[in-house]
Amino acid sequence: MPHPRGSDRANAREDARAAALAEELGAQLGRLKGAGPKIKQLLSMVQLDRPSDGERSPVGFGALPDGARTIPFGRVRRVIEQDLDARIGRLFDDIDEEPFAVASLGQVHKARTSEGEIVAVKVQHPGVAEAIETDLRSLGLVGPILKRLAPGLDARAILAEIRDRISDEIDFELEAQHQRRLQRLLRSHPHVKVPHVHTDLSSRRVLVTEYVEGLRTDEIKRLGEAERDRIGEVAFRCYLDLAWRAGTVAGDPHPDNCILCPDGRLCLLDFALLRDLDAQSSQGEREVMRALADGDAHRVHERLRHLGYLPNPRSVDPDELLEHLTTGGEWMLARGFRRIDQEYVTRIFELAYPPRSPHFPTMRRMTIPPAALLLRRVEIQLLSLLGDLNAGADWGAITAEHHSRKPASTALGHEEAAFWERHTPG
């Protein structure tokens, strides 16, 4: 058996090597000015580097994030008129020249249609799509660094999935399709609202939707504990229901994409990232969650091997694998009431991500199937959202309703279960 000090030195060398490779990866992504931040957000789902505070809840169309900028309204006008082939005065009776929301891809303006409806006009910044497409063609350059950092990772498949998802984000016509699909699915949902899309006023670079009044997350955080708990449960259940009941992974459950409507419903925004979860993957992921909840190391190992997470199964110890996954997934697995605050979120990230995670040797021997990349992103962003809300519930019991088809554990859960019984997708 190695001497403890020798083992400590070996671990320190491994940590230093991982940190150096992560820094090299960050530098490479930093050269990709258009897509770099988004690639890093998606790569954080592979658990190669601990997300920064900003990456835990990537900023959407709300606050002004680092690197985001507004553009003069004259350029916004040109994009709208070029894409919709009409003068802006014929498209809208009135439009605010100052945007009310900005992100790296574009900005959002409030407007009024000729029918008098107040709408949100999301306009892509000119040149952004071309810059991102150029970056995506260079994405293969980070593959060798990824393989050195995590030899078990199927870097080619992961990068192809990232390329596809980011390409989806810059296509507002595709986002409009996604939003119409979810708006139809959730139209009569008792607790959730999705704004309707004005298809005739939308294009590849312009997306016009219903404008929704309500409280943003910064205001929601000032509400009472009981209301924050309710909102947290609504958000958590909705994204789990979409994945496990509808087979649709909606990949952006972060604070800037949530509005509390005056009627108490939670309005969800931004559906650029959407991926169908096929029946085989869905069943396999459920089986993994059941095995984790049961603490069955060998069943977890077997299910993950079958799903493609373990390229060399013999190199991964089942007990170490179980410890790694139950540590990061504790909040979704453990039964009993838990209030999730920022301190708890920070602790989970420190345990689940290098360089501080004690499970990094196990992570390096794993990969993540492309179909599961957005699913993992949703889980991480939900944890961040619940931490922002300081929301409490028995998250383990709610999760078990989905992976083990347990009866609803709360009154709100019974209402949602009744909705899905009436609206199960065919």
Language model: regions and residue ranges:
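Short amphipathic alpha-helical recognition elements used for nucleic-acid or partner binding
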Residues: 285-287
